[in-house]
Regions:
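Glycine-biased, small-residue-rich flexible motifs in mid-sequence functional cores and linkers
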Residues: 1-3, 79-202, 206
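Short, positively charged patches
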Residues: 1-135
């Protein structure tokens, strides 16, 4: 777990959408980047000025706080060097450096992952179709990936869960966020068959307990 704090530190410093493929080519181990001086970071030629500033400002203690919160709540921290980190994500130039997982992300390993997302205010027919398609995909052995919103996202998860399949809910909020409390029963079922997944965390993650 000790090396994961450097992955979290780098994720917090870069934020969403960064071209991490270039950064990891220059610094495959975030720990070495953390201890690199300003000259080493600058001459690597993979950081913007803003990123260089954030690397200096981001505190390692915030990453350590995230680790403590995850440990207390039983959440897993998955980074690209872990065996359970999804191979599909590694092909992305802006892949998330850290996955915060409530559940078991290994359930999607060796499965085809298919995303289903849509409006929060779908028609009745659209909801039924999303639920049916997700159920068919899950029954065929695919992992259904969707967000945590109401509407099509929830319908997709409901269909996959009802079919006894695997589904992963990618949450658009930080650790410990009480997001859409009415959807907690569905999230509980998702945890049992798949996982809730957060891609990023705020500098000071909230502890729901």
């Amino acid at each position: 777990m000790s090396d994961k704090k450097y992955w979290i530190w780098l994720s917090q410093a870069l934020g969403a959408g960064a071209r991490v493929d270039e950064i990891l080519s220059a610094f495959p181990e975030p720990e070495k980047l953390y201890f690199a001086d300003d000259a080493e970071r600058m001459t690597a030629g993979v950081f913007t000025r803003r990123q260089l500033e954030r690397l200096n400002k981001t505190k390692l203690s915030d990453a350590e706080t995230a680790i403590r919160v995850c440990a207390k709540n039983g959440w897993e921290i998955c980074v690209p060097t872990d065996g359970d980190y999804p191979e599909e994500l590694k092909r992305l130039a802006d892949m998330p450096l850290v996955l915060y997982v409530d559940g078991d992300i290994s359930r999607i390993k060796d499965k085809i992952s298919i995303g289903i997302v849509g409006t929060r205010q779908p028609s009745y027919d659209s909801t039924c179709i999303a639920r049916a398609v997700a159920g068919d995909l899950a029954s065929a052995g695919a992992a259904v990936i969707s967000g945590g919103a109401l509407g099509i996202d929830s319908a997709a998860h409901e269909g996959a869960v009802a079919a006894g399949g695997v589904t992963v809910c990618v949450m658009g909020c930080g650790l410990g966020c009480d997001y859409l409390r009415d959807n907690e029963p569905l999230r509980r079922r998702i945890r049992e068959t798949g996982a809730l997944c957060l891609l990023y965390t705020s500098p000071s993650p909230r502890d729901p307990k």
